[in-house]
Design a protein with these regions (language model features):
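Surface-exposed, charge/polar-rich loops and edge strands
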Residues: 2-460
């Protein structure tokens, strides 16, 4: 088995905290300057079903949602699943092997390059209900100081090194990041669905026959259309130019785009494909994303100990029925948490104001300090429970309270169920140059990986 760590890039700074690393790679938050939001067409690379196989079997969820067991299942299926490109380490291979495979699949005809530059319309639906619809293109990379593409989470050097090594070896963007922006219009007038001109172009395009369509094992139907008309490209550019985009998902991949761009600029390279990165851009006025909560499981914290200590600073209400407890949590307007793991569930509300003030980092804004995840991290986990912040002590479960509670009961630990953050709070915090605490947001639906790739070779 090759030593896959040998080809990790060495030109990223080391020894920095996530805050320091993120500030350097995104760019320090300052008043808005520079060019506006750009999404440019590109010649997409797509699977050819007649050669590669059924599209449901060659695509996958985003790489960071794939654990080792899921990756092995995808690999066991053989064939051309994009996991062989996007997660080469799961197969014990180095990054260069993924790049070689990409070029081999292009030569064999399993992948094809579209003849003309295009923007792509992507849609995810369930049982005929559209959950997600937006534009896939090459988003212009901007320093955070430009106020155009806004991160809301810090990033870690390790995942950026991994993605940068892969992106360098493949010379390609293998999956899109997920961006949202407010296109304008409130959609409250009769016949007005909301959104800007770009959203209207998206809907008009989606009324036609899709380029590809399939139902995947996630229960969603995925569709893709292609826009090649330069006049429509120009309308999209004009509509989004003055907008801000929030990174809903893909902070480490966006940081990787920025690292690759910085590498080329440091080498004296002029403008090129490294000045943009593959992205799905969604008008949230027209198609609001689902913003789910990320629940915590603390395997080493007994439920009775957790509740006893929490009573010192929270009002605790006990429930026997899970559905009633989750519903009660959803109705609480302020910081609130639901603890599970034993036979009962325990709703924590009304945190002690003095304890809250003492536990909160003073350098953050009042809006940041009011986020449920900030209260959880600094008051409950850090101060009351004194649990270290690491992956062994704190596990996460996306969206599903029942799964988190069941996990806690299996481990003898404590589950902490949260309400989702409000999208407007996330955007406001990001707009001030702050980061929400780690594992605060779960935007969705996330775009399927493998629908369209962006190869950076000029000749492709």
């Amino acid at each position: 088995m090759p030593r896959v760590d040998d080809d990790l890039p060495s030109d990223l700074p080391s020894g920095l905290t996530p805050e320091e690393f993120s500030a350097g790679i995104f760019g320090t938050a300052e008043p808005r300057t520079g060019r506006g939001l750009e999404l440019t067409p590109f010649r997409g690379v797509r699977f050819v079903p007649e050669v590669a196989g059924d599209l449901a079997s060659v695509t996958m969820p985003p790489y960071d949602l794939i654990d080792e067991a899921a990756a092995l299942r995808l690999l066991a299926g053989g064939g051309h699943n994009i996991v062989r490109l996007n997660l080469p380490r799961a197969a014990g291979e180095g990054y260069d092997a993924a790049g070689d495979r990409l070029r081999r699949w292009l030569d064999e005809g399993a992948l094809t390059t579209d003849p003309d530059p295009a923007l792509y319309v992507y849609e995810a639906s369930r049982d005929g209900t559209v959950l997600q619809r937006g534009l896939i293109g090459a988003v212009g990379l901007r320093a955070e100081s430009d106020g155009v593409v806004l991160p809301h989470e810090n990033v870690f050097p390790g995942p950026v090194r991994d993605r940068l090594a892969l992106m360098t070896a493949a010379n390609a963007n293998l999956e899109p990041i997920f961006l949202v922006y407010e296109g304008g219009g409130d959609g409250e007038r009769a016949g007005d669905p909301g959104g800007g001109d770009a959203a209207r172009i998206v809907d008009d395009t989606a009324a036609g026959r899709p380029l590809m369509e399939f139902r995947a094992d996630d229960g969603l139907t995925h569709r893709l259309w292609r826009i090649t008309d330069p006049a429509l490209h120009a309308r999209v550019s004009a509509d989004i130019h003055g907008k801000q985009a929030l990174i809903a998902d893909g902070h480490h991949r966006y940081a990787t785009y920025r690292a690759l761009q910085a590498r080329h600029h440091a080498a004296g390279d002029g403008p090129g494909p490294w000045d943009a990165g593959l992205a799905l851009l969604v008008d949230s006025t027209r198609y609001p994303p689902h913003l789910g909560a990320i629940h915590r499981v603390l395997p080493g914290l007994r439920p009775d100990d957790a509740v006893e200590q929490a009573r010192k600073v929270f009002r605790v209400t006990d429930f026997r029925d899970e559905a009633d407890a989750v519903e009660a949590l959803a109705e609480v307007p302020g910081p609130a948490f639901l603890l599970g793991g034993d036979e009962s569930l325990h709703l924590l509300t009304d945190p002690d104001s003095g304890a809250l003030a003492r536990s909160m980092p003073s350098e953050h804004s009042p809006r940041w300090q009011g986020l449920d995840t900030a209260v959880l991290d600094h008051l409950l986990i850090g101060s009351v429970w004194n649990v270290p912040e690491n992956e062994d002590a704190i596990e996460v479960v996306h969206d599903d309270p029942s799964a988190a509670i069941a996990r806690a009961r299996r481990t003898g630990g404590t589950a902490v169920i949260l309400n989702p953050l409000k999208a407007e709070d996330v955007l406001a915090v990001a707009g001030e140059g702050e980061r929400v605490p780690r594992k605060s947001t779960s935007f969705g639906p996330k775009p399927r990986t493998g629908l369209v790739l962006r190869v950076l070779d000029h000749g492709r």
